[in-house]
Curated annotation (Swiss-Prot):
Belongs to the UPF0597 family. One of its GO terms (biological process) is L-cysteine catabolic process to pyruvate. It comes from the Bacteria. This is UPF0597 protein DvMF_1488. InterPro entries: Ser_deHydtase-like_asu, UPF0597. GO terms for molecular function: L-cysteine desulfhydrase activity.
Length: 446
């Protein structure tokens, strides 16, 4: 497998939720071909892009939410060269202008069928100009741009729809031992990048532990664990790095892993203007895949090299699960995919064997397989925290328990067999669930 290609495409910084990020990128790309700001914007979105962008905070948008606002910001102030960080430089004036555009009804959206699960089409209009930009296949992949009906750009790579790039096809076929061995083979440059991702995500967790972002899941749980308030009420109150992260050596490590990982999701879902390292196209996947092993490495005194290999395994397991279940699915990938990756990484850091790590993955599947995705929002911090805690529990069971010796329901001790089950459940069994969730989101839950 092309390890470098996998990590270059699948593990990268992302600002805010990646679904409205893809929408903002499409709008920013289209806006490049207009001589002045658009008068109208129309979005055509896959059901999953619609679902995951409907209720989530937009970075730098002062608490405002949704795909339509993301598209307006992208069109008025986005930088397409920044990919999933297209909104990194938006200002308060930009937010006011974008809000005005949406409030006067100039931004509309619709769900379209028979498109890839990752599909965001932004149509921008002003007199004499109609520009359409399409992001498809991956959140940061601009597939096509049309200006007044003429194609001015079309992606040259072979990716189309939901087809898999070669490295993901390799992951789909891989045995668990292959993932373990590939993680062994990372070079020094990749190891540094993986460690940088851990630093990024722990820094975001620090913010969530110190301040009550969103539902304040991590902040509240962290306060309870510390027996006091870690809130930073003053912008000038500089705290030492790590001062708000609960001590991972304490008596209830699972609770500390849960609080810290949830805290990072609190910050991200609230729309903080701070990037995280993503995994498999999702920032929350990245938080779940990275933070539990990073905390464990700190607690157990593991070397940077050991942590880097564990993180590589976590991302590879996450990617392998997503290769089977799909990029965006009715299942919560933070739990099923990234939780499995984190569990495998924790076993590796504890000097466990590949067989024990494979057991841990199966135990995560058995625990959280039924968790649904009802769109990105503040409540994702609850699911991310649960996934992190279950990853810890699964690792402990795999290291110290008897393990699974045969199938438990539709989960097998064999990694590939379980992935086949997950793929079928996701694509067939949960298809109606997605339809129902989107109908409820369109109608509005009171």
């Amino acid at each position: 497998m092309d390890i470098a290609a996998f990590f270059a495409a699948e593990v990268k910084p992302a600002l805010g939720c990646t679904e409205p990020g893809a929408v903002a990128l499409a709008a920013a790309t289209a806006a490049r071909h207009l001589p002045a700001p658009p008068e109208r914007i129309h979005l055509r979105l896959s059901a999953n892009i619609y679902k995951n962008g409907q209720s989530v905070g937009i970075p730098g948008a002062q608490g405002l939410r949704g795909n339509m606002l993301a598209s307006a910001l992208g069109a008025l102030a986005g930088d397409a060269d920044m990919g999933l960080q297209a909104l990194a430089a938006v200002t308060a004036d930009d937010v006011a202008a974008a809000r005005a555009l949406t409030e006067r009804g100039a931004v509309t959206q619709e769900i379209v069928q028979d498109v890839p699960t990752v599909y965001a089409e932004a149509e921008l209009y002003r007199p004499g100009h109609l520009v359409v930009a399409v992001v498809a296949g991956r959140h940061d992949r601009v597939a096509e741009v049309r200006h007044n009906g003429q194609v001015v750009y079309r992606a040259e790579d072979a990716l189309g729809g939901d087809s898999l790039p070669p490295y993901m096809a390799d992951l789909q076929r891989a045995a668990f031992g292959d993932l373990w061995n590939w993680a062994d083979g990372i070079d020094a440059d990749l190891a540094r990048d993986l460690l940088r991702g851990a630093e990024m995500n722990l820094a975001v967790a620090e913010q969530g532990l110190a301040n009550p972002w969103g539902l304040a899941v991590g902040h509240t749980l962290g306060m309870a664990l510390r027996g006091g308030d870690c809130r930073n009420d003053s912008a000038s109150d500089a705290r030492a790095p790590g001062s708000c992260v609960p001590d991972a050596c304490g008596p209830d490590i699972s609770a500390r892993v849960k609080a810290t990982t949830a805290a990072a999701a609190d910050v991200r879902m609230a729309g903080a203007n701070q990037p995280v390292m993503s995994s498999a196209g999702s920032g929350n996947h990245g938080l779940t895949a990275i933070i539990p092993p990073a905390l464990a490495a700190r607690a157990w005194g593991r070397s940077d090299a050991e942590l880097a290999r564990a993180l590589a395994l976590s991302h590879l397991v996450t990617g392998a699960v997503k290769a089977r279940t799909g990029r965006l699915t009715p299942l919560c990938g933070c739990a099923v995919a990234a939780g499995a990756g984190a569990a495998a990484a924790l076993v590796r850091l504890a000097d466990g064997t590949p067989a024990q790590a494979e057991q841990a993955v199966a135990l995560v599947f058995s625990s959280v397989m039924g968790m649904i995705c009802d769109g990105a929002k503040g409540g994702c911090a609850l699911k991310v925290g649960t996934a992190a805690a279950e990853a810890w529990s699964a690792a402990q069971l795999a290291l110290h328990g008897p393990g699974m010796t045969g199938a438990e329901g539709i989960v097998s001790p064999d990694f590939r067999a379980s992935l086949r089950s997950l793929g079928e459940v996701s694509s067939l069994g949960f298809a109606a669930v997605d339809v129902a969730i989107i109908r409820l989101l369109e109608r509005g839950v009171q």
